[in-house]
């Protein structure tokens, strides 16, 4: 079968870094070709070359079997190559139609006036093609992330794209929205569109992809059918067989209760929530998107106000007027959006680790004890196995897994005994996930009380000693970690009455 697009021996270097080294890749018409690899494997660089953002240094690119040089994003669009970025490029104050045809709006009267009727009509044709029930005149700011993504796909198709690159398209979608996206992808496949699908999510790739190409350290490791066992694909990605963590659930029933939450309420998003976590325990929170898990975490951390309820740390009632009160009591929170909450991406590693604790190193209230700051930072980098060239490395240049570890280090320096992890591995590759899992278990072994909120049920099952399930702001069930299954958790996640028994 002739490839829509193929690359052979493609190489690309940046100052001091060889990003791509003799890469091979091809995409056929009417297939979903998944591209997998750890962060830094070269996936994004390859896609940016195909999309015209970067120019290759050497190698060959073929479009419909003919050599081609892609000189710019506009040139890529003219060649029917479209890309849907993970971070959407839409303007909230404009309508869906205006976003799709921005800069190339249909006009009449010799180009003097915008032909708004045709603009909306052309957009409606695109939406009809996708079976998308959406008015072209809807402002982007009024749409969910999932709907905005559909608009991005329609925008790419407005250039008559035959090659569509999708970068982590389900990162912010719930299960129903993922099903809708997959329906559209299958429809585009049936029309002969070739789709490059970049994702870390193994289960999704097996559902939607036809083939998988694995990259590592800037090179192509191989291309295999999507039916290939995932352990084999993971081994290709990381260059080794990942150790399957053997789940051991310790008996923490006699341990001190570090965190106790009673009668927590906030409107309809948190409704009479009760739970406790003991020293050395990992408590998982499962539920569908919008169930209230993050809202509970933010309330316990003092980030959002509550209507009623109490929070106790080591038996002592604490007043939560702000996150500072929670931190002072020994509660640390790792947000699901670490780049906006929790990590100062423009600052270096050392500053991120020590900034909240600087008062500890003030001499006479005036001078910072810089050697002590450097020592504790170096200690944390070693303890958490943070991969960074130096303490002065800017945090945004670290991989997702190492950024997460820097945030953990910050709370450990603060001596927090209760650590709340909200989506701890979101956007993190499979090798780094394994490191984060190992770290969470080590922290529990050291006597920390850990709360893990995750939308990935296999992750909840792998980590949790106990699992609480939420639906519509209530806790609808508690399941012991050694008997929990995806089926039992999903049943509880769709159950609307609250848990009758007291949660211990």
From Swiss-Prot:
Task: Show the InterPro entries listed in the entry.
Answer: AAA+_ATPase, ABC_carbohydrate_import_ATPase, ABC_transporter-like_ATP-bd, ABC_transporter-like_CS, P-loop_NTPase
Q: Where in the cell is it found?
A: Cell inner membrane
Q: Tell me the membrane topology, using the record's own terms.
A: Peripheral membrane protein
Q: Which residues form the ABC transporter domain?
A: 5-242, 252-497
List the catalytic activities from the record: D-ribose(out) + ATP + H2O = D-ribose(in) + ADP + phosphate + H(+); D-galactose(out) + ATP + H2O = D-galactose(in) + ADP + phosphate + H(+)
Residues engaged in binding ATP:
37-44
Record-listed E.C. numbers:
7.5.2.11, 7.5.2.7
Q: What Pfam families is this protein classified in?
A: ABC_tran
Q: What class of enzyme is it?
A: translocase
Q: What is its main location?
A: membrane
Q: Which GO terms describe its cellular component?
A: plasma membrane
Checking CDD domains in the record gives: ABC_Carb_Monos_I, ABC_Carb_Monos_II
Q: What does this protein do?
A: Part of an ABC transporter complex involved in carbohydrate import. Could be involved in ribose, galactose and/or methyl galactoside import. Responsible for energy coupling to the transport system.
Name the family the entry cites: Belongs to the ABC transporter superfamily. Carbohydrate importer 2 (CUT2) (TC 3.A.1.2) family.
Q: What is this protein called?
A: Putative ribose/galactose/methyl galactoside import ATP-binding protein
Q: Which organism is it from?
A: Albidiferax ferrireducens (strain ATCC BAA-621 / DSM 15236 / T118) (Rhodoferax ferrireducens)
């Amino acid at each position: 079968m002739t490839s829509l697009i193929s690359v052979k021996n493609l190489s690309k270097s940046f100052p001091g870094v060889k990003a791509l080294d003799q890469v091979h890749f091809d995409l056929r018409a009417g297939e979903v070709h998944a591209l997998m690899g750890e962060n830094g494997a070269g996936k994004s660089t390859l896609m940016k070359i195909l999309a015209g953002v970067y120019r290759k240094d050497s190698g060959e690119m073929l479009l419909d079997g003919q050599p081609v040089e892609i000189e710019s994003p506009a040139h890529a669009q003219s060649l029917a190559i479209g890309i849907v970025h993970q971070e959407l490029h839409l303007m909230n104050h404009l309508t869906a139609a205006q976003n799709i045809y921005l800069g190339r709006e249909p006009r009449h009267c010799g180009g003097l006036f915008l032909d708004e009727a045709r603009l909306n009509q052309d957009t409606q044709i695109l939406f009809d093609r996708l079976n998308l029930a959406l008015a072209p005149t809807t402002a982007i700011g009024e749409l969910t992330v999932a709907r905005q993504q559909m608009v991005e796909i329609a925008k790419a198709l407005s250039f008559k794209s035959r090659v569509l690159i999708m970068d982590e398209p389900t990162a912010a979608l719930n299960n129903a929205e993922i099903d809708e996206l997959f329906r559209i992808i299958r429809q585009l496949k049936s029309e002969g569109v070739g789709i490059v699908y970049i994702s870390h999510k193994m289960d999704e790739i097996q559902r939607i992809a036809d083939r998988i190409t694995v990259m590592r350290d800037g090179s192509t490791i191989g291309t295999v059918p999507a039916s290939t066992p995932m352990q084999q694909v993971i081994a290709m990605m990381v260059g080794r067989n990942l150790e399957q963590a053997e789940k051991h659930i310790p008996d923490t029933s006699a341990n001190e209760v570090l965190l106790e939450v009673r009668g927590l309420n906030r409107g309809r998003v948190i409704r009479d929530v009760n739970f406790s976590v003991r020293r050395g325990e990992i408590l998982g929170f499962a539920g569908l998107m919008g169930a209230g898990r993050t809202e509970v975490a933010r309330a316990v951390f003092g980030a959002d106000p509550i209507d009623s309820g109490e929070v106790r740390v080591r038996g002592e009632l604490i007043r939560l007027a702000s996150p500072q009160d929670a931190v002072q009591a020994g509660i640390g929170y790792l947000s699901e959006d670490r780049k906006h909450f929790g990590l100062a991406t423009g600052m270096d590693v050392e500053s991120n680790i020590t900034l909240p604790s600087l008062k500890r190193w003030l001499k006479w209230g005036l001078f910072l004890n810089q050697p002590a700051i450097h020592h504790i930072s170096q200690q944390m980098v070693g303890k958490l196995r943070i991969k960074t060239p130096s303490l002065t490395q800017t945090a945004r240049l670290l991989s997702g897994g190492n950024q997460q570890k820097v945030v953990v280090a910050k709370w450990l320096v603060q001596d927090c005994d209760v650590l709340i992890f909200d989506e701890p591995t979101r956007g993190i590759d499979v090798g780094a996930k394994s490191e984060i899992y190992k770290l969470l278990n080590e922290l529990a072994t050291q006597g920390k009380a850990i709360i893990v909120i995750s939308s990935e049920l296999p992750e909840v099952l792998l980590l949790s000693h106990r699992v609480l399930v939420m639906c519509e702001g209530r806790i609808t069930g508690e399941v012991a970690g050694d008997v929990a299954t995806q089926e039992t958790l999903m049943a509880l996640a769709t159950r609307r009455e609250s848990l009758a028994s007291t949660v211990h």
